[in-house]
C-alpha cells in the first residue's frame, strides 16, 4: 500500500433506531427527564460502539443527547462509566453535563446536555488544532492531581498492547496487511521502545485516555468540548494531547515544532513521548485485518490502519528510522 487509508468518520457505527429501544426504556427515560420525548433524530453514525445515541427534543423545550445500550454490549458498561465519571470532573473541564440516567429491564441509558457541534480533524486546521491544544492544557491542569479516586493506571490499560511488536517478531501474531513497506525493518526498534512503558506511562493526572478527533466537539461559538469519558485512567499529564499529534502531522500541522514549545511536553524526555506513541501504534497493529465487532462498520479497521500508519510515520521522523531500503 503506497498511502494511508482514507476513513469516513461520519460512518463508523451502525446503531439501532429509537424505535428499536424497548417501550420500558423509553418510558423510563421520560420519567427520569420529567418531560415527554416528542422527537428523536436518527442515531449518530460516528463513534465505535453499537449503542443507541441520538438527539432528542422534549415537551419542555429542552434538547438532550441520549445514549442507551443493552447489557452484554461494550456500550452498556461504557455508558455507566461515563455517567459515574462526568459529574466528578472539575468545572474547568468542558464536558457535556449529565442530565439524568435511566434503567429498564437489562438496559441502561445516560442523558447529557445537547451540544450542537462538529468534529474537528477532518482534516485538522491550524485554528481547530489550537482550540484542541488549549483544551488539553486546561484539562491537564484541572485533573492534576486526579480529583477522582480509584483510577487504574494508563499502563494497566495498555499492558497487553506493549507485547504486540514482540509477538509479531516471534511469529505469534501476523503483521497487518497494507502498511508501509518499511514497517518490518523497524519492528525491532518499536519492540524496544515500548518496553519503557512501565516507567513512562504512569503519573498523577486523570487522563481521558481515548482522546481522538471524534471525541472532541467544536460548537457554533468555537468552543471545544471533550466527550466520551469512559476510559479515564491515571497517567502523565501530556498523553491526551500527544495522542492527537500524529494524525494532525499527517494532515499538515507542524506538531514536531509544537511538541518542543508546548508546556505539556517541552520538558518531557523524547523517549517518553515516543514510547507513548509507539504503544498506541502497537495497539493499532492488533486485529485490523479481522471483521469489525458488532455495531461497528468496516471503517473501524481502516481507522486502526490509518492510526498505525500515521503513528509509525511520526516515529520514523522523530527517530530517523530507515524508511528507504538501501
Each model region followed by its residue ranges:
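Active-site activation/catalytic loop segments of kinase-like enzymes and analogous catalytic loops
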Residues: 238-268, 277-296
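ATP/Mg2+ or Mg2+-diphosphate-binding catalytic cores
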Residues: 13, 255-256, 284-326
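A conserved alpha-helical element in kinase catalytic cores
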Residues: 64-105, 122-138, 239, 248
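Active-site acidic catalytic loop and adjacent metal/ATP-binding pocket
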Residues: 45-58, 65-66, 191-239
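Juxta-kinase regulatory segment immediately upstream of eukaryotic protein kinase catalytic domains
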Residues: 1-40
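A cross-family kinase active-site recognition segment
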Residues: 2-3, 119-183, 202-204, 233
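Short acidic/glycine-enriched loop/turn segments that link adjacent beta-strands
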Residues: 47-50, 104-108
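Conserved short submotifs of the Hanks-type protein kinase catalytic core
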Residues: 106-118
